[in-house]
Amino acid sequence: MLPSSIQPCSWILLLLLVNSSLLWKNVASFPMCAMRNGRCFMSFEDTFELAGSLSHNISIEVSELFNEFEKHYSNVSGLRDKSPMRCNTSFLPTPENKEQARLTHYAALLKSGAMILDAWESPLDDLVSELSTIKNVPDIIISKATDIKKKINAVRNGVNALMSTMLQNGDEEKKNPAWFLQSDNEDARIHSLYGMISCLDNDFKKVDIYLNVLKCYMLKIDNC
């Protein structure tokens, strides 16, 4: 059973602040909340519309970051080896594609998105920190990674707040895996960062799918 369609969504204010800081590039429009007694109220339908739009743009930006990193370090030996990459989220029981997501209950799908986002909280900090230590890394790559981290953090806060409001399940213990990048070998660190960005790219494609499937569910959109 879904909760009331109109709820106070304080996290929306955070996302709107993100937008005002020009972090919401390519989002043409977004719903505004209604103010009542100094509190922000927004329908869950509009909330998912907002989250779906933002997640899609982040997914595109992560793919761009991955392509730029791969192109810049294409001369590093073995960088593009197609051996299976084991990501920090590989153990999470989450839907692998859109078809599976469509068959997943909305509550479980929302939890899946939250699990992936939570699993990236510390690794995103490590990613931005380690990128700045690599020799000759372009400023644009560091800038994009920093920008993406801020946006993903906003989405994570929003999804967790939304999950708490919709599912009313309280805080659950989080077991977030670590990602170790320590190495004195420059090429080894580049390989690790490449794998890390590749995993982030794959994982955020999943988050994008989940939030947009949820948006279609909430808005009752067919053939989405």
UniProtKB/Swiss-Prot annotation:
Keywords: Disulfide bond, Endoplasmic reticulum, Glycoprotein, Hormone, Secreted, Signal
GO terms under biological process: hematopoietic stem cell proliferation; positive regulation of hematopoietic stem cell proliferation
Signal peptide interval: 1-29
InterPro entries: 4_helix_cytokine-like_core, Somatotropin/Prolactin, Somatotropin_CS
Subcellular location field: Secreted; Endoplasmic reticulum
Keyword Nucleotide-binding: no
One cellular-component annotation, GO: endoplasmic reticulum
Tissue-specific expression: Expressed in placenta and hair follicles, with highest expression levels detected in the outer root sheath and no expression detected in bulb. Expressed in placenta, skin wounds, keratinocytes and weakly in embryonic fibroblasts. Expressed in brain, cerebellum and in Neuro-2a cell line. Not detected in liver, kidney, ovary, pituitary gland and brain.
Primary location group: secreted
Modifications the protein undergoes after translation, according to the UniProt entry: N-glycosylated and sialylated.
Domain of life: Eukaryota
Function, as annotated: May have a role in embryonic development. It is likely to provide a growth stimulus to target cells in maternal and fetal tissues during the development of the embryo at mid-gestation. May play a role during wound healing and in the hair follicle cycle as a growth factor and/or an angiogenesis factor. May play a role in microvilli formation and cell proliferation of neuroblastoma cells.
Protein family (similarity comment): Belongs to the somatotropin/prolactin family.
Protein name (record): Prolactin-2C3
Species annotation: Mus musculus
